[in-house]
Amino acid sequence: MLRGSIVALITPMNEYGHVCETSLEKLINYHINNGTKAIVSVGTTGESSTLSQEEHINVVMLTLEITNKRLPIIAGTGANATSEAILLTKKFENTGISACLTVTPYYNRPTQKGLYQHFKAISENTKIPQILYNVPIRTGCDLIPETIIKLSKFKNIIGIKEATGDLSRVQKIKNSVHKNFFIISGDDTTFLDFIQLGGHGVISVTANIAAKIMSNICHLALNKNFKLARFMNNKLIPLHQGLFHEPNPIPIKWLAKKIGLIASDTLRLPMTPVSNKTRLILEKALYFSKITAK
């Protein structure tokens, strides 16, 4: 079972908008050396929506190669067409990828029946373990607990990344699924409460630049030391909040460059560079967190 701090890894690009392998390697080694438990490659934070499918696959495979079995790799493989999600997921079978993170179909807003059939089809047509991903603010549809519980019965659907921020869902899901089905927060601002209610960790944006402290907080929380975990997390709250002052991954890429983890904070359109107003917010949050240059 995946537990603890899992990073939703950014995809570093050079000034021309091409994937920067040097920065990617530096970033991955930073996580290996600072307690991150797994890497999500080319999810939302990894700019999956602006990479071609060829680039998407290449970044995941490069991440796998650099990591060299030192951490589990989870590949983002969601799509708004079920057939496309199946094809992309199958690309990672027999590669060494530990699991695929499959977001709910975005834009077309299916019913709960449609969502069930979508994930059922992926499960039945692929062998690799699947992690469901629910983030209604981005996709326009909500995978409700009752549907998650039904889907948990499929052998290769092993968990859920729950990014609604609705803490009432944690125990509702946990009390109705088998013991090996893991429930991971996808919301840095509420992840500690999420773990206290029975969750198993977080897929974190903040961890991109705060790997060690996020790993330590999760370790403390999973071992029921919530007093110290909260004390440590309090230093990160302005950062958790500031990272979503503009759409992810705009702020986190700027911060990763600022502290020297990546060489450039280049994004692809329609994502644009961070505003001066947000930079000030992020600089204050960085100072408060005491995170230093790498």
From Swiss-Prot:
GO molecular function, one term: 4-hydroxy-tetrahydrodipicolinate synthase activity
Keyword Lyase annotated: yes
Keyword Repressor on entry: no
Top-rank EC class of the record's enzyme: lyase
Catalytic activity line of the entry: L-aspartate 4-semialdehyde + pyruvate = (2S,4S)-4-hydroxy-2,3,4,5-tetrahydrodipicolinate + H2O + H(+)
Oligomer and partners: Homotetramer; dimer of dimers.
UniProt-listed Enzyme Commission number(s): 4.3.3.7
Species lineage: Bacteria, Pseudomonadati, Pseudomonadota, Gammaproteobacteria, Enterobacterales
Coiled-coil intervals, chain numbering: none
Pfam families documented for this protein: DHDPS
NCBIfam families assigned to the protein according to its UniProt record, in alphabetical order: dapA (TIGR00674)
Principal place of residence: cytoplasm
Pathway the protein contributes to: Amino-acid biosynthesis; L-lysine biosynthesis via DAP pathway; (S)-tetrahydrodipicolinate from L-aspartate: step 3/4
Annotated family: Belongs to the DapA family.
Active site: 133, 161
Alphabetical UniProt keywords: Amino-acid biosynthesis, Cytoplasm, Diaminopimelate biosynthesis, Lyase, Lysine biosynthesis, Schiff base
Name recorded for this polypeptide: 4-hydroxy-tetrahydrodipicolinate synthase
Site entry (Part of a proton relay during catalysis), positions: 44, 107
Record: residues binding pyruvate: 45, 203
Gene Ontology BP term (one): diaminopimelate biosynthetic process
Function statement: Catalyzes the condensation of (S)-aspartate-beta-semialdehyde [(S)-ASA] and pyruvate to 4-hydroxy-tetrahydrodipicolinate (HTPA).
InterPro entries for the chain: Aldolase_TIM, DapA, DapA-like, Schiff_base-form_aldolases_AS, Schiff_base-form_aldolases_CS
Cell compartment(s), UniProt: Cytoplasm
Cellular component GO terms held in the UniProt record: cytosol
